[in-house]
């Protein structure tokens, strides 16, 4: 056998096997597709295990990988929250005593809601124990001691086999969990002031609060151009809803990392979003005609002119998402885990 032919066997044998405990539950039909695709993309040398507090406290693993750590500290009831926070403190003591490295993915610069001083203190402790950070866009500020850039993967493969909807001319779409920071209330107010009869607005997603549900239902009752599907929707339904629109509208009050934006691009739909450094980087990455950015107020004048602008913009058949392919993302995560353990990360590549 030639030396080149034997190289893959040598590399595979040299790749250290490691066990990674993820802070999320075992994937199911309702799991965020980002997580499901990440777990599927990990190389065979990574043995994934999924979170329970019992597993985290009593078992052995090489690395703890945290996504959205605030959710480990929260419960609908006050007593449940106290219990989860007490268990989390025990876990952090264990990690500190055993020297188990923590890897943390920065999905947000900070939690969207502030849940009090105990949560803030525990999150600071987690920060202190984090040995490597993963930022999913290159504009996120780096954090000590080490930060790795692994771009958020696309959803193109995830939706490839799902039926696409027929485009409804003039339809605008806002989708995802309906939360106050996403600007839905502003979008509804602006839509009432838009005079263009070609435009309609579709809201798809589960309201985070009863107040948000009432807000959307009232707008639908008052304006026949506005319709909504207010529920958690399965992915085939979501694929049809997204592909049926001409433009996805995301008037977020704050926007740094957005899986919603990438999901829309994965289904080849143009997006209107506020200017931010991260959104500008994505707009440049994917090519012209896919991401339209605005600065200042989101208002009727802006929304009224968007349909003609989107239709006139030159664009390719699909946005360029080649930097976000999952096999490479899995290998880069493996490298981060090895380096968190003080091993040679090049063994992963």
Curated annotation (Swiss-Prot):
Catalytic activity: beta-D-GlcA-(1->2)-alpha-D-Man-(1->3)-beta-D-Glc-(1->4)-alpha-D-Glc-di-trans,octa-cis-undecaprenyl diphosphate + GDP-alpha-D-mannose = beta-D-Man-(1->4)-beta-D-GlcA-(1->2)-alpha-D-Man-(1->3)-beta-D-Glc-(1->4)-alpha-D-Glc-di-trans,octa-cis-undecaprenyl diphosphate + GDP + H(+)
EC number: 2.4.1.251
One Pfam entry name: Glyco_trans_1_4
Protein name: GDP-mannose:glycolipid 4-beta-D-mannosyltransferase
Record keywords: Carbohydrate metabolism, Cell inner membrane, Cell membrane, Glycosyltransferase, Membrane, Signal, Transferase
One GO cellular component term: plasma membrane
Keyword check for Cytoplasm: no
First-level EC class: transferase
Coarse class of the protein's main subcellular location: membrane
Pathway of action: Glycan biosynthesis; xanthan biosynthesis
Gene Ontology MF term list: glycosyltransferase activity
Presence of keyword Signal: yes
Organism: Xanthomonas campestris pv. campestris (strain ATCC 33913 / DSM 3586 / NCPPB 528 / LMG 568 / P 25)
Lineage of origin: Bacteria, Pseudomonadati, Pseudomonadota, Gammaproteobacteria, Lysobacterales
Superkingdom assignment: Bacteria
Gene3D superfamilies: Glycogen Phosphorylase B
Residues of the signal peptide: 1-14
Similarity-based family: Belongs to the glycosyltransferase 94 family.
Annotated function: Nonprocessive beta-mannosyltransferase that catalyzes the transfer of a mannose residue from GDP-mannose to glucuronic acid-beta-1,2-mannose-alpha-1,3-glucose-beta-1,4-glucose-PP-polyisoprenyl to form the lipid-linked pentasaccharide repeating unit of xanthan, Man-GlcA-Man-Glc(2)-PP-Pol. Is involved in the biosynthesis of the exopolysaccharide xanthan.
Localization of this protein: Cell inner membrane
């Amino acid at each position: 056998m030639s030396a080149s032919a034997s190289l893959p066997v040598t590399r595979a044998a040299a790749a250290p096997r490691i066990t990674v405990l993820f802070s999320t539950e075992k994937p199911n039909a309702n799991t965020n597709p980002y997580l499901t695709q990440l777990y599927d993309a990990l190389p065979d040398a990574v043995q994934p295990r999924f979170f329970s507090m019992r597993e985290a406290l009593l078992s052995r693993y090489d690395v703890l990988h945290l996504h959205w750590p605030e959710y480990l500290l929260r419960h609908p009831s006050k007593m449940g929250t106290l219990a989860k926070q007490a268990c989390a403190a025990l876990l952090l003591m264990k990690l500190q005593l055993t020297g188990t490295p923590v890897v943390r993915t920065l999905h947000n610069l900070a939690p969207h809601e502030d849940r009090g001083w105990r949560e803030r203190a525990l999150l600071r402790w987690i920060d202190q124990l984090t040995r490597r950070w993963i930022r999913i866009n290159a504009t996120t500020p780096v954090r000590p001691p080490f930060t790795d850039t692994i771009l958020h993967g696309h959803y193109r493969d995830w939706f490839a086999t799902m039926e696409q909807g027929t485009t409804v001319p003039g339809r605008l779409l806002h989708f995802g969990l309906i939360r106050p920071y996403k600007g839905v209330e502003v979008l509804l107010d602006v839509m009432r002031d838009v005079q263009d009869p070609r435009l309609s607005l579709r809201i798809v997603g589960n309201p985070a609060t009863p107040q948000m549900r009432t807000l959307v239902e009232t707008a639908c009752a008052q304006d026949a151009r506005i319709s909504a599907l207010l529920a958690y929707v399965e992915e085939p339904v979501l694929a049809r809803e997204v592909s049926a629109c001409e433009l996805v509208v995301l008037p977020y009050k704050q926007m740094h990392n957005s899986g919603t934006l990438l999901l829309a691009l994965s289904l080849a739909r143009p997006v209107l979003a506020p200017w931010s450094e991260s959104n500008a980087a994505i707009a440049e990455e994917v090519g012209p005609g896919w991401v339209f950015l605005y600065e200042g107020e989101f208002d009727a004048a802006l929304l009224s002119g968007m349909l003609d602008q989107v239709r006139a913009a030159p664009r390719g058949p699909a946005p360029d998402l080649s930097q976000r392919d999952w096999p490479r993302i899995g290998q880069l995560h493996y490298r981060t885990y090895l380096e968190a353990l003080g091993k040679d990360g090049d063994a992963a590549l």
